[in-house]
């Protein structure tokens, strides 16, 4: 199959298995959820009644005071007491094998092509790391919400886009399922497309 390049009259020959496969929603959902879960810190921690300092002595005798019986001032029903089902640090990551991950990326790329959200250009860059220059270039292409994917890290592009809302710059190694679906359009250089094909082959 062919992908028409926006800044050239030629078209780029690409693999049908990478850019023309059927959309597998269940697989994409599973991989995106796993990716997001892996980004969680999982460092939340609370103290149970046995971990809160103090509370070893019975506050008052069992009977004869007229008050409700109490065995510890660190009971979960007391102020400053422990937490009944205290949250503990945990690993939220989910296992996703390489085949599934690659399949999800292929599925997303194919869907981007179908929805005409993938824009391929011969080259994309700016002469200086100026946000104004990048905004002008994107305005020219009528792009506001876009992920720019280049073959290698472009320092000028990265610095210019750093302060822009809804604009991100990644190299091929930095793409992931979440970033590919998070933006309205995905702008890729021809070299980046070739590298992605090799990576997913």
Curated annotation (Swiss-Prot):
GO biological process, one term: translation
InterPro entries on file: Ribosomal_uL4, Ribosomal_uL4-like, Ribosomal_uL4_dom_sf
Alphabetized UniProt keyword annotations: Ribonucleoprotein, Ribosomal protein, RNA-binding, rRNA-binding
GO molecular function term, any single one: rRNA binding
Pfam families: Ribosomal_L4
GO CC entries: ribonucleoprotein complex; ribosome
Region (Disordered): 45-66
Family note: Belongs to the universal ribosomal protein uL4 family.
NCBIfam families cross-referenced by the UniProt entry: rplD_bact
SUBUNIT field: Part of the 50S ribosomal subunit.
Role according to the record: One of the primary rRNA binding proteins, this protein initially binds near the 5'-end of the 23S rRNA. It is important during the early stages of 50S assembly. It makes multiple contacts with different domains of the 23S rRNA in the assembled 50S subunit and ribosome.
Protein name: Large ribosomal subunit protein uL4
Organism of this sequence: Aeromonas salmonicida (strain A449)
Lineage: Bacteria, Pseudomonadati, Pseudomonadota, Gammaproteobacteria, Aeromonadales
